[in-house]
């Protein structure tokens, strides 16, 4: 049987107190809507329709290529939101999943089980329910004397007895598609909210003797709908625990999972060790047997096997096998370290490529440079690559030795096996195998110190 999906992503999310549409708020580095769409994609959906409304164009811009959408111009309730998908779905034969775009914790496995249960029960509607420790705010599942689902009552419409019920509606359903769209033509706004409730179709089905099933969630956390920043933080914490658990069972050591923040798209190889207070974001790849020490931050980068990142920041950069950085180094966007490169403490590199075995041990800035193999940078070296308007490139060939406190005024080229003397200001190209000296000659004025303010006598 064909499977379809309607993802509700039209709401403003007033309680978020944000200019950003609610479904675009991120959990573990990815929007809530993206999490939901990923889970939906795991159950072989024939047609997926996203209902957009508030800031529709911003939401549409984030959708995967080819995703169908419908704009809900007026937000008149969940029933209305589903009904406007009729032109795309009403004539289809099959079962339709309806799910909110602000439920980032629900998994593809759960949605697959929900479809299986729906088909096994031969139901017209199947509700994903959960037993809530505190059901306040949720719609309640009302069952009859035979324990069959009778209806769903929203919090604002519930009486005292109904409010005491702990089985809640998670807001995720599967319906027989044609029955759903037929029933949606019969719902009204006769309720406390003055809206078209999707849940009213349950009573319509029940009155004509159709089967209503309820599948209870094993993990209540999956039911979390995010309506404010508090719930957003809860979703973040739960997602982080899931992510960290998955990495650990796959052979990654997390010294302190409670302070380790790893986004959902990060890949990490076995035998890697990650210490406390580490953040790894975006589309980051980390190979095998990598050490990442306390306080490091890595974003949208590639760190290959046998590397070390010690108390450092790595952004949009690539570290090849056996390279190491830190402590307190900063690889800025566009940096590429070849194999066995060493970048030490208080070194900043931007938009540069360093060849195999090159070393920049301390207090160095390298920007917009192409550096060969086994080049050594002495402490205090900088490439002066910016004239206030334009950036300029520096080329340094294999085996060059850059003396401490050298200032390299780009653009220029330093040749193979060349050496710059300590303290030099390099303003011209340096040929292969040349020694460059770009500093004033030292002069010692004997006895002059006695006339200086610092002098304290013999």
From Swiss-Prot:
Disulfide bridges in this chain: none
Record-level GO cellular component terms: cytoplasm; membrane
Region Pyrophosphorylase, residue ranges: 1-229
Name of encoding gene: glmU
Alphabetized Pfam families for the sequence: NTP_transferase
Cofactor: Mg(2+)
Organism: Lactococcus lactis subsp. cremoris (strain MG1363)
Region of interest (N-acetyltransferase), ranges: 251-458
Catalytic activity: alpha-D-glucosamine 1-phosphate + acetyl-CoA = N-acetyl-alpha-D-glucosamine 1-phosphate + CoA + H(+); N-acetyl-alpha-D-glucosamine 1-phosphate + UTP + H(+) = UDP-N-acetyl-alpha-D-glucosamine + diphosphate
Protein name as catalogued: Bifunctional protein GlmU
Main location, first listed in the record: cytoplasm
Active site (catalytic residues): 362 (proton acceptor)
Superkingdom of this protein's organism: Bacteria
Region (Linker): 230-250
UniProt keyword DNA-binding present: no
Annotated GO biological process: cell morphogenesis; cell wall organization; lipid A biosynthetic process; peptidoglycan biosynthetic process; regulation of cell shape; UDP-N-acetylglucosamine biosynthetic process
């Amino acid at each position: 049987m064909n499977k379809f999906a309607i993802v509700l992503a039209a709401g403003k999310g007033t309680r978020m107190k944000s200019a950003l549409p609610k479904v675009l708020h991120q959990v573990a580095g990815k929007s809530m809507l993206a999490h939901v769409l990923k889970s939906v994609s795991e159950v072989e959906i024939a047609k997926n329709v996203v209902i957009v409304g508030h800031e529709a164009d911003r939401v549409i811009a984030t959708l995967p290529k080819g995703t169908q959408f419908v704009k809900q111009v007026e937000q008149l309730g969940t029933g209305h939101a589903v009904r406007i998908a009729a032109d795309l779905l009403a004539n289809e034969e099959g079962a339709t999943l309806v799910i909110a775009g602000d439920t980032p914790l629900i998994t593809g496995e759960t949605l697959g089980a929900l479809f299986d249960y729906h088909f096994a029960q031969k139901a017209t509607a199947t509700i994903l329910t959960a037993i809530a420790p505190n059901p306040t705010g949720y719609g309640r599942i009302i069952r009859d004397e035979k324990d069959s689902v009778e209806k769903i009552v929203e919090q604002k419409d519930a009486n005292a007895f109904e409010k005491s019920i702990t089985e809640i509606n998670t807001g995720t359903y599967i319906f027989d598609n044609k029955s759903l769209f037929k029933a949606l033509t019969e719902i009204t706004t006769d309720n406390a909210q003055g809206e078209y409730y999707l849940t009213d179709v349950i009573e319509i089905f029940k009155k004509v003797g159709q089967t209503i099933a309820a599948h209870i969630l094993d993990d209540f956390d999956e039911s979390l709908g995010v309506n404010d920043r508090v719930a957003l933080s809860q979703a973040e914490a739960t997602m982080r625990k899931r992510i960290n658990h998955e990495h650990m069972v796959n052979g990654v050591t997390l010294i302190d999972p409670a302070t380790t923040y790893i986004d959902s798209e990060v890949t990490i190889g076995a035998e890697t060790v990650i210490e406390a207070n580490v953040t790894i974001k975006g589309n980051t790849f980390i190979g095998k047997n990598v050490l990442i020490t306390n306080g490091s931050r890595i974003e949208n980068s590639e760190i290959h096997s046998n590397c070390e990142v010690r108390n450092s920041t790595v952004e949009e950069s690539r570290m090849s096998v056996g390279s190491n950085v830190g402590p307190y180094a900063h690889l800025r966007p566009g940096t590429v370290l070849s194999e066995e490169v060493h970048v030490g403490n208080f070194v900043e590199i931007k938009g540069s490529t360093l060849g195999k075995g090159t070393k920049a041990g301390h207090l160095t800035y390298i920007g917009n440079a192409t550096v060969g193999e086994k080049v050594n940078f002495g402490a205090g070296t900088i490439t002066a690559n910016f004239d206030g308007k334009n950036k300029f490139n520096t080329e340094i060939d294999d085996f060059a030795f850059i003396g401490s406190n050298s200032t390299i005024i780009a653009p220029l080229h330093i040749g193979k096996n060349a050496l710059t003397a300590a303290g030099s200001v390099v303003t011209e190209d340096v040929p292969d195998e040349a020694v460059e000296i770009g500093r004033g000659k030292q002069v010692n004025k004997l006895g002059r110190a006695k006339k200086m303010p610092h002098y304290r006598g013999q």
